[in-house]
Amino acid sequence: MVLVLVLLTSSKAFPQAAAPATVSVVGGAYHVRGDILISDQFNNRVIEVNPRTHQIVWTFGDGSSTAGPKSVVAPNDAQVVGPLTLIAGTGAPPGGEPSCPNGCADNRVMLVDVFGDILWQYGQAGVTGSGRNQLNTPVQATFLPNFDVLITDQGNQRVIEVTLWNDIVWQYGQTGMTGSGYNTLNNPNSAELLDNGNILIADENNNRVIEVNREHHIVWEYSNGISGAAFASRLKNGHTLITDSLNNRIIEVSKGGAIVWEYSTSSRPGSVTNPNPTRAVRLANGNTLISDQFNMQVIEVDRKGMIVFSQGQISVAGTGFNQLNAPYDAKVVGDFTGLTPP
């Protein structure tokens, strides 16, 4: 724990150090600004790619569907935190992994170093629970400026803030209880800390995005036409960017609820019928980075809806060069536009 704190507090900026050959696939640099960190869900790995060459420069996860010290099962989220990488080991649902047709658990949130060593984790490998140091399908984790970690513990119907000493210091949602009323959630899929101290939650099965304060009151909500709220982030202009997964679209809505921008991932050439995008992140250049899950791609689109970058081959799952398998999350290293900065 002390090592983690030393590493994080001594990191003045994102490093651009060479990655060790035992971890890097092709050598080169690690955590370079502009690289893309991808949670390659059903390939059971987190990868960092150079967007200019499409080459993988760093990876965590050996492809195993069993949670272990060098593996991660169906990761749904990853974030660069100084010299470390925060990873949500979500676990695969039934039918997601051929090697475990009934589903395979991971249930860990981990801080991993460049060598692929786990320096900190909350949750126990393959153990599903709601007690101390236990999780149930953690789909997202956000490292907070105070060094706590905000975890969207989906199967336990809660968002929890935990310290690096594994103490829960705040919770929204009642453990194991679904609902849409006061302090309840239904399959939450993401949570972001806002500048005002409130928490923005994508409450997936309630088909809504809510902003809640620390006293558990909803102070803002958007639910108009939403089906499967997968992710939400608050932009600097006060708008909210929402991944409306089951409607296969990304929308930007004003504080008053007006849709000011929209992009449909199912309308592009080669798309499957229901790609169910899972993450949309606004970038500093004004474009939007989208994890277009079942189209097997991460794409960057501009305000006009033109694709200016893609990683992966549309509708083709694989582990080879420039291939992905149901990518769930992607972020540009060093770009926290609209996201909680660590």
Language model regions located:
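Bacterial N-terminal signal peptides
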Residues: 1-12
